[in-house]
Amino acid sequence: MVEMALRHVYKKYDNAEKYSVTDFNLEIADREFIVFVGPSGCGKSTTLRMIAGLEDISEGELLIGDKVMNDVAPKDRDIAMVFQNYALYPHMTVFDNMAFGLKLRKYDKAEIKKRVENAAQILGLSEYLDRKPAALSGGQRQRVALGRAIVRDAKVFLMDEPLSNLDAKLRVAMRAEIAKLHQRLNTTTIYVTHDQTEAMTMADRIVIMKDGIIQQIGSPKEVYDTPSNVFVAGFIGSPAMNFFKVTLKDGYITNDGGLKVKLPEGRNKILVEKGYEGKQVIFGIRPEDIHSERVVLDATPDACVKSTVVVSELLGAETMLYTKIGDTEFVSRVDARDYHKPGEEVELAFNLNKAHFFDVESEEVIR
């Protein structure tokens, strides 16, 4: 059983003008699967390396259990880490690669054999223990790297973009493998990725970062349904949320390009009470909340817009329909049968009960 906490953690490198990580606060429950996600340079890997002890903490505290770990050596933190690079020894067999850390720690041969064979069985590597890394596929090499961490029997697993070197199909398969592995091992896991799909499919909770600052912490459903700001709303979800700068007036939102839709009474009331009547707001709506079915168009005439097709992408079961109103281009996820040629005019209905509104200046959500 292990709980972790990062309290007011900062990281600033020597001679740097800005902090790489600013006031990072997070409580992690025992056996929780936490994902740090954000664009390159947001501080997610730096934070992971501070937890591992590979980077010093400039300010703040890291606790594992009830012990402050700031000055504890990496080897004494009872942490196992999996890196983006497999870092396998090419001259060693799979068995020896997985056993290497245990040998350094002077475990006896029987215990090493037991741990390696158990990890190999979990990862489906039992028949490959005598092979060298060159004889393995990319997915098998990544499993060996995971096995090297598993044999440690550590309290905490840290994973720094472990799937980024794999092709798209293999990444999907390995996502499921890591999720199943976490359930089997019952460990606390912290996983770093720039891929929001990995974060959404694997995490118990997601920590979304930008410029070294936490933007939002929540379950995948929470960050998808109730994003805290424009950055989170645009980062989580694929395709990304559409944004329009609009003016609120007499229950309608409009823009210069010709967008005009009527808000549900409850949504309009919130915006008016917050002082946005007659002012600009950012209107966000996800592609899956824009509809082209005639039954929806007929039922919601005040939420319909006419737009011009830019391009249609047929993806089998659905079509990504890129259209524009005036100069504003947006994307809708519609039925595969709604395939249109560029230049055609189409009518679309916004599900305004699923709309999001943000302040123009702060870009924070309006609730």
Q: What is each PLM-predicted segment?
A:
Residues Y252, D256-V309, D338-R367:
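Glycine/charge-rich catalytic "coupling/switch" loops of P-loop NTPases
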Residues A52:
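Helix-to-loop junction immediately C-terminal to a conserved catalytic motif
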Residues E61-L63, K67-V68, I213:
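ATP-binding/catalytic-site motifs of ATP-hydrolyzing domains
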Residues L26-I28, F350:
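Conserved hydrophobic segment flanking the Walker A/P-loop of ABC-type ATPase nucleotide-binding domains
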Residues V37-P39:
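The feature captures the beta-strand-to-loop junction immediately N-terminal to the Walker
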Residues S58-E61, E111, D211, A355:
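Conserved coupling/switch loops of ABC nucleotide-binding domains, chiefly the family-specific signature
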Residues P74-F231, F235:
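ABC ATPase nucleotide-binding domains
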Residues M1-L6, K11-D23, V72-A73, K106:
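A short, flexible loop at the N-terminus of ABC-type nucleotide-binding domains that lies
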